[in-house]
Every structure is written in C-alpha cells, then in structure tokens.
C-alpha cells in the first residue's frame, strides 16, 4: 500500500527497494486528476490493515459479512480514525453484499429455499484465492465454497452461508440496508444482483424494482 500511495503522489519516477517488492523505476503517467489522491478504499478485516487505513486517512471496505461482524470492524476503524485526528464520513465506508430482491418477502424466501435445497451451481464465485484451494488439495483438507462468505472480523471462515446479505421485498431490503447504515456508518454499498439461477431478465427486473421502491427509502436515511 505504501508503494501504491507513493506512486500516485510522487511527481517524478523513483526506485523502490522494499521488503517484498524491488523496482528500479516506478512512475504513473498520466498523473491522477484528484490531488493529493483519488479516493482510496482499503478492503480488509485484519486489525493491522484497518489501523493502517485509519492512520493514512483512507477509506474502508468490508465485504459479505453479517451486520454484527461488520460493525465490529467499522467500530475499530472509526475509533482509530479519531485517534489519528479525523472523522470518517459515510462516503469513507463501503460495504459489498449480495442481494436478491423480489416483489414480496414471500417470493424472495421461496427463491432462497429453492437455492438452499439445491447443490451449489458452477457460477458461485470463488471468493478465496486459488492458492488457498491448491494448498488445501496438497494437504488433503476441505475446501468448501459454500462457506466462503461467512466469517469473523478476524478473517476466519465458518458456517454454510450462501452469501445473500440482503433478501426480501422492497421494505425488508431497505430496512436491512438501513441497519448497516445506522450501526456501521456505511454510506456506499456495492450489491451484485446476479445470483445463482437468476437469469438476465430477472436481474434487470430486480434492478428496476430496486430503483423504483428501495432507493427512495434510502434517500431518507
């Protein structure tokens, strides 16, 4: 991260002799328009990186965790930001979580029940790194895709979650988003609507429904 930040801010080419990376010449051209930096968001769960983001006045990104575990991370971040002499705003905290939105809670739950009763499809995303999967194969340990989005702020992976963070009709999904906003200080959300067994027309219908029924509620937060 130090290398990236210097590359974005240093006006002249420079050499880098770090612990992990050595480069004879580093230069970014054209220069970033934003000064001193474009918005930088650090996606992390580890305490040392959370503190790094806070001390360097960088944004924080959290992905796919339940609200309780997300709050544990954002509470640390905001406390360390205060220690560093600044207060992060909502735009500094980003959350990424999967969504399935339907006209009613009943329809959303019906889809989810059908998903839980089937085996994971081939398009479930691989959120762990390939190297971890290879290492698991080498030592004969289990590598279960179904649990990759469950975990704790310390980064361990437990459970059998299918990773749908926002599920329900418009009012339910709006209230779920509001809980992340109120408890975690999150002001930016990134939600992949494409889920297992959801085709493109259904995704477009979800997005239209979200814009028509959920966004007006979010604007009132």
Question: Language-model segments: which ranges?
Answer:
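Hydrophobic faces of well-ordered beta-strands that scaffold small-molecule active sites
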Residues: 40-43, 58-62, 91-98, 187-191
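Glycine-rich, proline-tolerant flexible connector loops at the mouths of alpha/beta enzymes
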Residues: 64-65, 192-203
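Short glycine/threonine-rich loop-to-helix capping motif typified by GTGT followed
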Residues: 103-107, 199-209, 219
């Amino acid at each position: 991260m130090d290398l990236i930040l210097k590359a974005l801010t240093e006006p002249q080419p420079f050499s880098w002799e770090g612990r992990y990376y050595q480069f004879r010449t580093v230069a970014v051209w054209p220069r970033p328009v934003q000064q001193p930096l474009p918005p930088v968001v650090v996606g992390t769960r580890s305490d040392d990186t959370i503190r790094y983001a806070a001390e360097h006045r960088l944004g924080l990104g959290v992905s796919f965790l339940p609200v309780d575990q997300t709050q544990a991370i954002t509470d640390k971040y905001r406390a360390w930001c205060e220690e560093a002499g600044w207060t992060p705003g909502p735009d500094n905290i980003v959350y990424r979580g999967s969504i399935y939105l339907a006209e009613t809670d009943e329809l959303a739950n019906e889809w989810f029940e059908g998903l839980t009763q089937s085996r994971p499809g081939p398009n479930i995303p691989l959120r762990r790194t390939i190297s971890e999967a290879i290492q698991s194969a080498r030592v004969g340990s289990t590598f279960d895709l179904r649990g990759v989005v469950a975990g704790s702020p310390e980064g361990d992976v437990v459970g059998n979650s299918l990773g749908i963070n926002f599920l329900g009709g418009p009012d339910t999904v709006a209230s779920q988003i509001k809980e992340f906003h109120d408890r975690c200080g999150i002001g930016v959300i990134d939600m992949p609507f494409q889920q297992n067994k959801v085709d493109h027309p259904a995704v477009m219908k979800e997005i239209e429904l979200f814009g028509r029924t959920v966004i007006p509620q979010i604007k009132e937060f």
